Each structure stands twice: as C-alpha cells, then as structure tokens.
Regions:
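C-terminal alpha-helical interaction appendages
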Residues: 24-26
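Short-chain dehydrogenase/reductase
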Residues: 9, 13, 17
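NAD(P)-dependent Rossmann-like dehydrogenase/reductase catalytic/cofactor-binding core
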Residues: 1-7, 28-29, 34-133
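Structural/interface elements that position substrates and couple domains in central-metabolism enzymes
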Residues: 16-22, 42
C-alpha cells in the first residue's frame, strides 16, 4: 500500500508541476492573466478531468489527431528548468499568496476564509489551493 501511495504521489506531483510550469509561462509571456487561466482550467480542463483521465480523453479524440496536435503544441510549451522571473520577483518581494495577502491576486480576510472553505470541502487533499474567484 505504501508503494502505491508513493506512486500516486509521484504521478500527481509531476502532472501538477507540468501544469504549473505552463501556467506560469503563459502569464510570463503575457498570453493570459492568472484570472484567465483559472477560469479556463475550472470551466474546461478541470471538468473534463473530473470525469475521465487524460488517456481516456485522448482515446476519444483519436491518436492520429492527438499526434498532430502534439506535433504543433509541443513546440510552444515551456521547457524551462528555472522558475519564471515574475514568480521569483513575487517571492523576493514577500508576496507569497494567501499567507501574506497578495501574490498574483490580492487576498482580503474574507477571500482567505472563502478559498479555504472551498478547498477544504472539495475533497482535495490540499487544505489551500491556488484558485481565486
């Protein structure tokens, strides 16, 4: 059982890291704002992944189309090995998110209570996530 938990943790951590890196790159490259990304993830990817895993989704799309899409998109996806400048600047200036009241978003006390309540009740293993309304 412990080995299975380790495997699940490894998979989850790596998938989150890939999504995290690309989200930061989209903001850094001024392709989208944090709000844009949160909205898209909550209303598209998140909903799809709640009912089917990536391979189940790709099986429905068809591997020929997935291969074509991957051939184009993979050229554009970040492969940076370092955190983006905007993230380093925020951390260096003490903007740590909910903990300090600011990050990519400004957090009032009411916002902090709301986001913690939302994530605590979501079934997520995280007590606090990075989404904002």
């Amino acid at each position: 059982m412990a080995q299975n938990k380790q495997k699940v943790s490894l998979i989850e951590t790596r998938l989150r890291a890939a999504l995290f890196r690309e989200c930061l790159a989209l903001v850094e490259d001024e392709v989208a704002s944090p709000e844009d990304i949160d909205t898209v993830v909550k209303n598209t990817i998140g909903r799809r992944l709640a009912v089917g895993g990536p391979f189940e989704i790709w099986e429905q799309i068809g591997w020929d189309l997935v291969q074509t899409i991957a051939g184009e998109l993979f050229k554009e996806i970040s492969n940076s090995e370092e955190p983006v400048r905007s993230l380093r600047n925020m951390v260096n200036s003490g903007q740590l998110g909910v903990e300090t009241g600011s990050g990519f978003y400004e957090w009032s006390k009411e916002d902090v209570v709301e986001i913690r309540h939302r994530f605590d009740g979501s079934g997520s293993e995280d007590s606090v996530g990075g989404a904002h309304r």
